[in-house]
Amino acid sequence: MELHSLKSTPGSRKEKHRKGRGHAAGKGKQAGKGQSGQRKRSKVRLGFEGGQNPWFRRLPKRGFKNINHIEYQPLSLEALEKHFLENEVVDLEKIYEKRLVTKRTLPVKLLANGKLTKKLTIHVHSASQSAIQAVESLGGKVEVL
């Protein structure tokens, strides 16, 4: 016995049944599609519910996406308190290095969460008014890029 002379066992390999190829073929006429109708002829479009009002028309329109919206990564005063020393300059590279924010693609916004007791010079893309006040009250400086 050699590989080129092997034959499959009779009945182990079934032939594919070709539907819709006449009555004599056994699966002619409706070809397993049921009665004649729209869904027999071809596919129905996406979202079609058989004539019932589809969900995207039943539900009301709501809201919009503001194309001018800027998504910021928050940076809290509490995080700066933990990771930086007195009189240190806090720039974006140091912030990324200490993993206080993760995505380099998004701008960083300083928020007044927590307490700050150190004088720092901070360079960020944006800052809240209360965060700027908290830093400047200690003699620090916030520079918005």
From Swiss-Prot:
Q: Which Pfam families match?
A: Ribosomal_L27A (PF00828)
Biased amino acid composition, Basic residues: 14-26
One GO CC term on file = cytosolic large ribosomal subunit
Q: Which GO terms describe its biological process?
A: translation
- Coiled-coil spans are none
The UniProt record lists the keyword Ribonucleoprotein:
yes
- Alphabetical UniProt keywords: Ribonucleoprotein, Ribosomal protein, RNA-binding, rRNA-binding
Compositional bias annotation for Polar residues: 1-11
Q: Region Disordered: start and end of each range?
A: 1-48
User: SUPFAM superfamilies from the xrefs?
Assistant: Ribosomal proteins L15p and L18e
Q: Which domain of life is it from?
A: Bacteria
- Record's subunit section: Part of the 50S ribosomal subunit.
Q: Which family does it belong to?
A: Belongs to the universal ribosomal protein uL15 family.
Stored NCBIfam families: rplO_bact
- Indicate what this protein is called per its UniProt record: Large ribosomal subunit protein uL15
Q: Which gene encodes it?
A: rplO
